[in-house]
Amino acid sequence: MNIYLKGNIKRLMLFLILTLALVCKTKPEDKYIWYSPREVISNADKLQPGDILILSKRPTLRSMWGHAAVLNEHKKIVEFPSYSAGYSESPIYAWQNINRKVAIFRLKGIDDKFKSVLFKEINETITKPYGLTFHKNFDKRLYCSQFVYLVFKKAGEKTGREVNLDSNGGGWVMPFDIMDSDLLENISLY
């Protein structure tokens, strides 16, 4: 490979990294109610199955987008946290030492029928691997916020309700896209 081509590739990579860093900082976090993981754990009785948990962004490659998870019918955190884990289910207290803030969201008008279908959709994802995809509706492998988006969307389709949690309609769905959805309310624990 010639020197000219190597230099252009380096510039392109630097441009892409800087663009991604800028994009991940475009949503203000201060318009939401945030809690420490310990506050969430100590107020777990106020959480409901079907609640969406969003972790705040951090200035690292792995966490610069935030993170999304949902509570199943047993109020356990279900998520797609990484390539090595794929689907993961853990008690709420498993997040007690995470050094990030947590925002809690609930689908407006959620009822028992919707929750029942939602939990079936969650259970159908157990064997799917983690993976980044370039289209949010591709469900052969999933990343955290795509998982949340798809289980709510499919539950909505099966209950006759349109539930599109992607607030900006892009090809990907990120945690902060979900947070901005008009279909959700940010839950206060106090």
Each model region followed by its residue ranges:
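Activation targets extended, charge/polar-rich intrinsically disordered C-terminal tails
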Residues: 25-32, 134-190
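Glycine-rich catalytic cores of cysteine/serine-nucleophile enzymes that process amide/ester linkages
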Residues: 47-108, 130-139
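Solvent-exposed, polar/charged alpha-helical surfaces in well-ordered, non-transmembrane soluble domains
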Residues: 45-51, 116, 120, 124, ...
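Sec-exported extracytoplasmic/periplasmic mature domains
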Residues: 82, 123-127, 149-157
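Extracytoplasmic/periplasmic, Sec-exported soluble proteins
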Residues: 39-45, 57-63, 110-117, 135-144, ...
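A structural motif
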Residues: 77, 108-127
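Protein maturation boundaries and topogenic segments
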Residues: 1-48
